[in-house]
Amino acid sequence: MTHESRTYTTARAFCGHHAQPGVTQVPGALDWSQQETTPDQACIEAVLETVLLPGAAILHVGVGNSQFAHRFAARASRIDGLTLHPNEQTHAATLALPQYTVYLLNKYSPAFRAVLPHRYGWIIDTNPAHFACCHHHFWRMWANYLGVLTPQGQIVTCQRGMNASQADCGWTMTYGDLLRLEERFPVQVAPLTDGVYGIQPRDTAPVRRRRVAA
């Protein structure tokens, strides 16, 4: 069943719960442990294949089937993952990949930085607003990410993922919506390829910006 997509403009400012962000109640929306890798995830993985250096520390937000970790574990010093469903955490543990840890943690939560003890050169999130309950927790998520990102690190997302939202939460995003980050945080946003975008701390070497329809 289709639903009317929300945008940042039409989403609510605050859900009313500071400490506990809302979570979708749509059946099956949270457990992707036995599903195939999504097209948006595949697009990001294709980019990482060309730029990921040995020894990278990666945070993968929304681990799904953990095939991302399986693919990149050999060249990473650490891959930490986040999930909202215990089945994904259990599935990840069965793979017994070295330096791979999955946390049951909401990316919009104020507990984010207390739970994650490391810093990362790469943070992968196919759709930052997919499960967002409100503007307040959406902006908290970005503060969470920047709090664990290294000074030369990069957050990577994908337009195909940003085009989706849940029936009861989240909203779609455009490249123009991502550019709003530059007004709130010391970051720069730029396309890495058509449809895959990178967000970096502003004081790093500038990324050449390609023209993208907002």
Segments (PLM) and residue ranges:
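Class I SAM-dependent methyltransferase Rossmann-like catalytic core
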Residues: 3-51
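Conserved class I S-adenosyl-L-methionine
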Residues: 55-64
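Class I SAM-dependent methyltransferase SAM/SAH-binding core
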Residues: 65-109
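A short acidic, Gly/Pro-enriched loop at the edge of an enzyme's catalytic core
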Residues: 112-123
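A short beta-strand submotif of the Rossmann-like class I SAM-dependent methyltransferase core
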Residues: 125-128
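A short, conserved alpha-helix within the catalytic core of class I
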Residues: 131-145
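Conserved beta-strand signature within the Rossmann-like core of class I S-adenosyl-L-methionine
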Residues: 152-161
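Class I S-adenosyl-L-methionine
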Residues: 167-214
